[in-house]
């Protein structure tokens, strides 16, 4: 057996704003939770997945300075996640922001609506279809 496959990674890399939270980001301390996504994260956590949150929050505000984001933004993020009982194993700040008219392209990506409505098997089939 291939040594790299001995420990199969089961990780979800999840965006924060507009995915785990609802869209209104005028006050990050009071932003509404997306309960459907949070419930699904708990489900995947129970299946043994690691939950890694990756966010572009405040990348414009601090002009990409991750050190300032770690000081000023990360404590607000962890407090909000804990208050809303969001499972997470890691938080990665400094995700490049695509702008208002750009978007992210990834061959293993699913949209929040697909994540909440599809089974793990359906999601895997969706991703496998991208590789064909």
Predicted regions and their residues:
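Catalytic phosphate/metal-binding cores of nucleic-acid and nucleotide-processing enzymes, i.e., regions
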Residues: 3-132
